[in-house]
Swiss-Prot record:
Pathway: Amino-acid degradation; L-histidine degradation into L-glutamate; N-formimidoyl-L-glutamate from L-histidine: step 1/3
Residue numbers of 2,3-didehydroalanine (Ser) PTMs: S143
Enzyme Commission number: 4.3.1.3
Family the entry assigns: Belongs to the PAL/histidase family.
Name of the protein this chain belongs to: Histidine ammonia-lyase
Organism annotation: Rhizobium rhizogenes (strain K84 / ATCC BAA-868)
Catalytic activity: L-histidine = trans-urocanate + NH4(+)
Coiled-coil boundaries: none
Length: 511
């Protein structure tokens, strides 16, 4: 099913659907008129003699050089090919499809001056599954994501490389096999296509969506760990969180209450438990995970604005003037990526402490050492906990802010840059690590709850444990563990663990 986009009001929900489902996107036809109007204005300038940046001048530090009208098409071609300087592995295909969709939104605002032909080609590539090969490295997140977007644009011209029908082909062959025709760029079109924040924004959105999925799963595993440790649900009382007032904290506490409702384990120790308070990793879940939820929601609003923005340069304004500005600078995206990294780091940190609690007989309230049957003969989940610590610590190192590291480029014309692109790209690795941590908690918590038999956990958590056990059986004796850890991580990453509980329990990304 094709997702129809209305530039200026595209929602996080639509963007998440594009990312997770791979459905193609197209612009609503009502935006064609604005695109055509801006394109006509650019064509008018290109036919004249007055120099206007990006239309009939050089670029960056070469902006003062006037280009002959006969060379305008060559100028755009040279711009794209010279800017194809990306290095590293290709970006994931679902990220590239999101990049292309965001570029559609930006062009659809009618301020870029491209012909409708380019919009139709991007739509056609999405519909037919032509995905440009975009190397992951090469952007500093200012003057747009120039190098990576040049690789996207090169395919539209019949250059570069693209994935199509499971093959990696040269751009011309991919278009031909898909029944699409490459374009010859007209005035400003190359600049409009590469001068934007769509790569950084798509990567940040991918990080956001993945972080939120992991955050939801961590509430399930956190509630499960609470029952496994025979922790108290009293700290999740709604009045406590209403008195503080943070919505993420309120929503997280409500989710934990919903997940634990009906637990026989919980009821068994409400009265007469000699422990006065649980460790913070159990008791302060609403405060920590709730703060992360608030942060992700705030970042979501920033990225939703950016996803609907026009970020190339110069721009065709509503009065038909063409004005140079700096919307290509991705500082808001860089800040957003840094904040997501902090949330990812903290969700993993508190999850890892719950894992450590459950494998430690001094803290786990009667569970065997390392959750092993016959500890000593079996090591149980001893090294799974160590792996979770390794993943947590790697995320701590990766969470250093990227946005504070500017460097001058392009002969000091572009003398302050955002570093948004690699700041956002690291979120893919960080969320992979987080999926691994939460997956390990799923294994430790499920094993811990099973040791409490015949006491039963809640109906919701029983469903979650059944989902875990559908991919990883109970650990009765030591076995090769790497496959178990991967299966648990994949379960979290796929969203299947979240889908195992009632849909209305887990807090959404949008308030």
């Amino acid at each position: 099913m094709t997702i129809t986009l209305h530039p200026g009001s595209v929602s996080l929900k639509q963007l998440a659907e594009i990312y997770w489902s791979g459905e193609p996107a197209k612009l609503d036809a009502s935006f064609d008129a604005g695109i055509l109007k801006a394109a006509a204005r650019i064509a008018e300038i290109a036919a004249g003699n007055a120099p206007v940046y990006g239309i009939n001048t050089g670029f960056g530090k070469l902006a003062s050089i006037k280009i002959d009208s006969a060379d305008v098409a060559t100028l755009q071609r040279n711009l794209i090919l010279s800017h194809c300087c990306g290095v590293g592995q290709p970006l994931p295909e679902n990220v590239v499809r999101l990049i292309m969709s965001l570029k559609l939104v930006s062009l659809g605002r009618g301020a870029s001056g491209v012909r409708l032909e380019l919009v139709r080609l991007i739509e056609g590539m999405l519909a037919k599954g032509v995905v440009p090969v975009i190397p992951e490295k090469g952007s500093v997140g200012a003057s747009g994501d120039l190098a990576p977007l040049a690789h996207m644009t090169a395919v539209m011209m019949g250059h570069g490389e693209a994935f199509y029908a499971g093959e990696r082909l040269d751009g011309a062959a991919a278009l031909e096999k898909a029944g699409l025709t490459p374009v010859v760029l007209a005035a400003k079109e190359g600049l409009a296509l590469i001068n934007g924040t769509q790569v950084s924004t798509a990567l940040a959105l991918a990080g956001l969506f993945r972080a939120h999925r992991a955050a939801q799963a961590a509430l399930i595993t956190g509630a499960m760990s609470t029952d496994a440790a025979m922790g108290s649900s009293a700290p999740f009382h709604p009045d406590i969180h209403t008195l503080r007032g943070h919505q993420g904290q309120i929503d997280t506490a409500a989710a934990l209450r919903g997940l634990l409702a009906g637990s026989v384990i919980r009821e068994s120790h409400i009265e007469g438990d000699e422990r006065v308070q649980d460790p913070y990793c159990i008791r302060c879940q609403p405060q920590v995970d709730g703060a992360c939820l608030d942060l992700l929601r705030s970042v979501g609003r920033t990225l939703e604005i950016e996803a609907n923005a026009v970020t190339d340069n110069p721009l065709v304004l509503s009065d038909n003037s063409v004005v140079s500005g700096g919307n290509f600078h991705a500082e808001p995206v860089a800040f957003a990526a840094d904040q997501i990294a902090i949330a990812v780091c903290e969700i993993g940190a508190i999850s890892q402490r719950r894992i450590a609690l459950l494998v430690d007989p001094a803290l786990s309230y009667g569970l065997p050492a390392f959750l092993a049957k016959k500890p000593g003969l079996n090591s149980g989940l001893m090294i799974a906990e160590v792996t979770s610590a390794a993943l947590m610590s790697e995320n701590k190192q990766m969470s250093h802010p990227a946005s504070v590291d500017s460097t001058p480029t392009s002969a000091n014309q572009e003398d302050h840059v955002s570093m948004a692109c690699h700041g956002a790209r690291r979120l893919l690795q960080m969320t992979d690590n987080l999926f691994g941590i939460v997956g390990i908690e799923a294994l430790t918590a499920a094993q811990g709850v099973e040791f409490r038999a015949p006491l039963a956990t809640s109906p919701e958590l029983t469903l979650a444990i059944a989902t875990i056990r559908s991919v990883v059986p109970t650990l009765d004796v030591d076995r090769y563990m790497a496959n178990d850890l991967k299966a648990a991580s994949d379960l979290v990453a796929s969203g299947a663990l979240n889908a195992s509980v009632s849909a209305d329990i887990l807090p959404s990304l949008e308030i």
